[in-house]
Amino acid sequence: PAEEAAPPSEAPVDPIKIKVKLDKPVLVVPGETATPIIYLHGRCGDPTAFSAWANAGKKFGTIISFTGDQKCKHGTRTQWSVDDGALDRRITRAIEAVKQELGIEIDPSRRIVIGYSQGSLRAEALATRFPDRYPRAVLIGGPRGPRETSLSKSEAVLIMVGDHDARQHLREATEKLEKRGKRVRYLELPDARHGEYGSA
């Protein structure tokens, strides 16, 4: 019998740059549901890094990638301040700008927040301070596990880390969240060092 043709690989995603009034532009991949998926890069990291999983992610909602609010010392990249209220307001404004510009339905009331490294700390803070707006959090490659006082009202938490990255602290954090009765899952990214999403 003839061999079956391999399924076509998905084309890489090309994010759309959307201007936001009185703020930096955001990068957007329109999704298949009305859920906004907020992506926060790492310290001096790459806001386009989410492209590695955008094809899978857009099935769950519209991905909106933000740029940190503080400049790094060298180059043009950015990092995050600890003003969670200001970040939440930035996200709300950006969601509205994306809805207006692209004419797509986005429900701002329930957001998934995804943070990488330093961005995971900001994602944790948003999910802790505003649990109704950020009921689900994905924390990737965090420099520490979530604090014991964090995520008390979260519906679900996913902790991810590269299998070539420091990860014992995140495994232990997952166990602590489980003991607190949280709905939490731990995943390792194959062939991934810090700053990478690996081969999967």
What are these regions (language model features)?
Residues 104-116:
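Alpha/beta-hydrolase fold nucleophile elbow
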Residues 7-28, 32-106:
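Serine-hydrolase catalytic machinery in alpha/beta-hydrolase-like enzymes
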Residues 132-144:
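A conserved short beta-strand
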Residues 115-119, 123:
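Gly/Ala-rich beta-loop-alpha elbow adjacent to hydrolase catalytic centers
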Residues 67, 114, 140-141, 160:
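Alpha/beta-hydrolase-fold catalytic nucleophile elbow
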Residues 160, 165-200:
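C-terminal catalytic histidine-bearing segment of alpha/beta-hydrolase fold enzymes
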